[in-house]
């Protein structure tokens, strides 16, 4: 779909922002950057695991708070590790919009996979997002979401409830196998 938009009126053609380096997000960036002769922005991967696109090397390394400006608006890079150690969301103040990549998705909870993912960082990053003034979430998967504070609060509570179930089971059982713990954490 993206390739078909190249050259159309709908294609922003001055830079590519990569939210993180999982294989469903960054591999096409190099191709598009070369085809359009534009730079990529993102963060290098910190952990080598099977989910990562190790070939991604951004032209510009992002840091929290970096502003990326166009003639019409600025995007603020918001560092949100958790789903991936190099994950960024992008805040567009004039549109009251937070582009969340895989940090918040519509229709499912986010996978936090070891060794690159961190539930502690994920929850901290969700709290950070609550400090921004926006009324729409643009996820990397699924439709736009409204009521962002309600959505974020629900995700945090849901994650903490899952954790509490696991801890309760661990405290009340002499033995529980890993598969049963995983099943319990997904309910």
Language-model features: where?
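Single conserved hydrophobic/aromatic residue that forms the stacking wall/gate
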Residues: 1-7, 12
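Metallo-beta-lactamase
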Residues: 14-24, 74-172, 178
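Short internal beta-strands
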Residues: 16, 39-45
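Metal-dependent catalytic neighborhoods of phosphoester/phosphodiester hydrolases
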Residues: 27-36, 52-53
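A short helix->loop->beta-strand "cap" motif at the edges of active sites that frequently abuts
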Residues: 36-39, 134
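Short acidic-hydrophobic, aromatic-tinged amphipathic segments that line or gate anion-handling sites
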Residues: 60-63
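Short acidic, hydrophobic short linear motifs in intrinsically disordered regions
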Residues: 175-187
């Amino acid at each position: 779909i993206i390739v078909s938009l190249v050259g159309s009126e709908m294609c922003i053609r001055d830079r590519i922002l990569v939210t993180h380096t999982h294989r469903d997000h960054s591999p096409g960036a190099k191709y598009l950057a070369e085809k359009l002769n534009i730079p990529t922005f993102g963060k290098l991967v910190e952990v080598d695991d099977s989910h990562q696109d190790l070939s991604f090397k951004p032209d510009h390394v992002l840091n929290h708070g970096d502003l990326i400006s166009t003639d019409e608006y600025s995007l603020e890079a918001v560092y949100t590790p958790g789903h991936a150690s190099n994950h960024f969301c992008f805040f567009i103040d004039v549109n009251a919009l937070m582009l969340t990549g895989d940090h918040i998705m519509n229709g499912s909870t986010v996978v936090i996979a070891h060794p690159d993912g961190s539930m502690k960082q994920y929850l901290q990053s969700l709290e950070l997002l609550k400090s921004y003034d926006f009324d729409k979430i643009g996820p990397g998967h699924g439709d736009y979401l409204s009521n962002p504070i309600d959505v974020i609060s629900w995700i945090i509570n849901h994650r903490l409830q899952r954790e509490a179930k696991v801890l309760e089971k661990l405290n009340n059982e002499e033995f529980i196998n890993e598969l049963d713990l995983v099943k319990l954490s997904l309910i």
